[in-house]
Amino acid sequence: MIVGTVKEIKNHEYRVGLTPESVHELTAHGHAVLVETGAGEGIGAHDALYERAGATIIATAAEVFARAEMIVKVKEPQAVERAMLRPGQILYTYLHLAPDPEQTRDLIASGATCIAYETVTDASGGLPLLKPMSQVAGRMSIQAGATALEKAHGGRGVLLGGVPGVLPAKVVVIGGGVVGFNAAQMAAGLGADVTILDRNPEVLEKLGMYFEARAKTRFSNRANLAECVAEADLVIGAVLIPGAAAPKLVSADMLKTMKKGAVLVDVAIDQGGCFETSHATTHAEPTYIIDGIVHYCVANMPGAVARTSTYALNNVTLPHALRIAELGWKDALRRDPHLLAGLNVWDGKVTYKAVADDLGLPYTPAEDAIA
């Protein structure tokens, strides 16, 4: 198969779909790999490294799209990239379609076969292609929140871990999954006063056993959430419903109960955000203030630590890419129901139910694509 990767063009996105090591694996299995010139510069991988791994360097993204049978990316294709997709071409990347009707319409119109990293599952029901970026984003959310709490950035002027004789910041993490766990781990490690909210008693039990006295856990209901948010210096939104738009758990009215200069970090912004007042921001302009509350809603947080993120991502995406290239997408999906769960759009149809439901579009079961 001819596999292609291009330079990411989303604002301040420095990751790349394939590392030179991944290219070497693909070419060693007999596949041709096309790499847009400069695609790996953000992780310190220059064209010569890709050439040594067996790739052919291509001058433009347009030529890569025109020649490749499968495009491997990191972030959802931007409008100019979507216009280059063609019927039957495979797109393998993060998509986050539920809150993005425009992208969904374009992918439907393209006729491409679109496999989303974030909905591929594993035997335990986890999301293995989302997990490493969730780990990165969870940890980064605390770094970003700590910076936003500084007075110069509009925050309360509170040090996350405090100092002897001065109380630490109160950090509230909404959601105890991969993002929430990593955020809580970082915040607790810095000495913050951490509370984690979740609706799953088993998750709360596991978190309680892990953190012991270093973090508190509370069941997530309206009353507990409102109380915790009102007391917080920093709130991390770490809620995920696989493939679906995130629920709006913190309302605009709740902001009025918060301390002025408190910070909201919405890690769920890729799926539309879990705060009513959230809208996507960029690394160039990461924050805005509503009712005195600082909002950090960068939609590609791991892009800021591109090298770590790219290698962590390739560790989990490459095996599936190899399988698709070796077998073709239909056979690969027939043999692996977990990879089949990643199929979001095929032949002009939405094949992931949560996306179809959220956008009010007709739903075609993914199984129809491999029948």
Task: Name every feature range the model reports, one short phrase each.
Residues 209-291:
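Rossmann-like adenosine-cofactor binding region
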Residues 69, 75-76, 95-96, 221, ...:
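Short glycine-/small-residue-rich Rossmann-like dinucleotide-binding loops
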Residues 118-159, 269, 274-371:
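Adenosine-phosphate binding glycine-rich loop
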Residues 5, 34-37, 57-59, 73, ...:
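General beta-strand structural signal in soluble alpha/beta enzymes
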Residues 6-45, 152-237, 287:
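Glycine-rich phosphate/diphosphate-binding loop of Rossmann-like nucleotide-binding domains
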Residues 2, 8, 79-169, 298-300:
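Glycine/serine-rich phosphate-binding loop and adjoining beta1-alpha1 elements at the start
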Residues 2-110:
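An N-terminal-biased, well-structured beta-alpha scaffold segment characteristic
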